[in-house]
Amino acid sequence: MNIESVVLPALEFMRLGGNGEPDGRFIRRNLCKYLRQHRKCSLFITQGYICRNAAGEIDNLQRGGSDYTASLIGAAVRAEEIQIWTDIDGLHNNDPRIVPNTVPVRLLSFDEASRLAYFGAKILHPLCIQPAEKHRIPVRLLNTMQPEAPGTLITECAEKGKIKAVAAKDNITYIKIRASRSLPAYKFISKVFGVFARCKTPVDLVTTSEVNISVAIDDPERLQEIVAELGKYAEVTVEKDMVIVCVVGDLEWHNVGFEARIIGALRDIPVRMISYGESSSNVALVMRSSDKSRALQALNEYVFV
């Protein structure tokens, strides 16, 4: 085809700031400088995943970093569309490794896609939506083996009145914390989250009441320390080998019946915890890993109707 192309070295413009996050201003300034040097060129090739940190050392964007690189570059040049090419026809409405006859989701909002990526959809890096959403750039997920397939389009628009997809996040630890009677409720909540903050352990899900807090975490590295600290003023129960199953879609309060379908589908499965997302786009449930396959299959049968 004889198309003129230029290789842009990613290490010259992809950089992390002092906080360990991509430095968007640096990326835009230095990338655009290279692009201006090749105004007549229409095809640019670069590397994904790698970058430099604030000290100038070679670093990386961690797992799935190539998708993140594409999104950061798209945001830097204010692209009309960001395309992520994989080996599957878009993001499916359930896990095709477990559930037969899954189908691609044709349209997702940025928030819906972020939730699915965070809670286990392997096709998409959880962070790659953020740069695109910030600059309102659509993201399209396409299949290299079937380039004519429509794939999945991710935009700021959300379809109303639909459940879109189900995803699952493995290796979850569930912690139930019951306050001692001597501790006022407001101090209890403050102390609990203070422990997780000091141990630098993110909380995936949380539900609270006056004397009970339940949390789900995916980083058990400092679990022993967390339990010891919480045990000073609370009764602590830990269950390992759990999974978060997340249902994503238009779950606004006025869409009566969606929650009933979700709970009805899981009526024979013990659910430890239910948490509603702050954006009304997802409901997350914690259960045993051994119940994961049965839960995904049941949800596939009952919620996509």
Residue ranges and their predicted role:
Residues 1-124, 129, 287-288:
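Nucleotide/pyrophosphate-binding catalytic subdomain
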Residues 4-6, 82, 139, 203, ...:
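Hydrophobic anchor at the start of a short beta-strand
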Residues 10-13, 49-50, 86-91, 96-97, ...:
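Short, ordered loop/turn segments at secondary-structure junctions
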Residues 38-53, 117-136, 140, 178-186, ...:
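Electropositive, surface-exposed helix/loop patches at the edges of structured domains
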Residues 74, 132, 299:
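Residue-level signature of catalytic and energy-coupling elements of molecular machines
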Residues 110-155, 159-178:
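A conserved active-site cap/scaffold subdomain adjacent to cofactor or substrate pockets
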Residues 150-305:
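A conserved regulatory-domain signal marking ACT and ACT-like small-molecule sensing domains
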